[in-house]
């Protein structure tokens, strides 16, 4: 493998050893390359571990892959994780220091809505009022309440501060009642991972000190996306004495304010708490001159240095309707495929092209045109979680959840609904009550899974053998049977991905890893035009990009327009545009 060549400034940063470091790295400046090179250097010189934190599982995998390409042994000295993955590991490793008996199950947003609605209907002061709302008003109420609950957790408001900070007594009571309901199910949500890990660390100095001594160096990528809870977890790990922390980020790429993220935690809090040495990376190795010239109009930043030797193309087009826009974009895609462009080796394929929008609904007209033209395309996904389509796979997954968490009556009820039974108090009773032979076998096999999942392969094999031997009349079509087969094969791949990443297997940990998107199987490059929102595509790149739906109210978003040009919301829209362009 050829040695990566760094610029003199990149090399200087990659060679730094002790002390706090802040790297302000503009788009396309090679920050991941610098980060990996520094981690590689640190891992080779420490007997302990380097902690590398990033914000997506894909970024984690990219760092692991780059390190393994140099030397697989380096991975023994590096722990790469997202903040949520790190916090899940901290909680699971020290569950005895929490209020939980066993590692709780991570509930998704749909689960949270069901629990919150149950909480509201069981609260006398809210129940009658809630029942008087129409369906739309109920949905809006649930979303607002869940947002407020998340805000409390992301703001790291502990119980002794609740009454001081949250003046609305009804909201306080709803928050506490919701938590009690979740506790009764031995469940947590994604925000709980951060809050509970933070509480565990600050209330147990010995545990915090254990991590402080374990991780000699800490590196955080995409630090402009930090929210308060994540920053406080970082502070709880490092304490006041651990200063070997490196943050890498770009204020101009901060686009997650709706999740409580803010570049102030990188630019202000980190600077005040750690007094880092600050470096700037402004050279762009990704985008052509025309692209950067356009980006500079958006963010008014004249520090970006162009390094690529070609000009590139950046054009604006205006259309009267979304249909006309979609027709012209697809026509443009057709005319580009098979041609050669400056700075790109070979002829353009559909896979070299991406169509981006502020919101997914904007891409609907593009999808219609691609379909009618019989052109290949796919939607970019985040990779978080795993949703099954077939009844059999859904039943197996729900049964696996209940098998790992017998307190979970929510998913027990969902399982009963799917397999057509009722009034069961346990997984065993569900198995006994199912009349459909194949579903009965599926749920029974899930109920027999070992705590460590050691029989997962054999269990899935048994289900697939039953599927092959089953009467075709049990399925509506051959396609339905094939869909079931594919989903169980996919589940097997997810288990394989999980098993490769850990030394001690756990069925509960596997299910949580799936919820966190940590088991997503690296797929082969998908042929076709990529359709994506800007948020989902962040950190990725394409040779040709069409940015659509740039009308006022859509991009920029109407809520940002209401807030005004100087608002945080409007700055986020500008950052979104900058990310999309670069």
Specify the residue positions occupied by each region the protein language model found:
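P-loop NTPase Walker
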Residues: 1-100, 209, 293-296, 579-582
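Conserved helicase NTPase motor core
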Residues: 2-24, 79, 107-113, 166-268, ...
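Helicase P-loop NTPase motor core
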Residues: 27-35, 275-277, 282-375
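Short, polar/flexible loop-turn hinges at active-site or ligand-entry regions and domain interfaces
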Residues: 46-49, 70-78, 94-108, 120-136, ...
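ATP-hydrolysis module of ASCE/P-loop NTPase motor domains
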Residues: 77, 97-188, 215, 278, ...
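Conserved helicase core region in the C-terminal RecA-like lobe
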Residues: 81-89, 219-222, 248, 359-361, ...
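ATPase/helicase motor core of nucleic-acid motors
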Residues: 272, 312, 347-479
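Accessory C-terminal helicase-associated subdomains
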Residues: 432-536, 557, 565
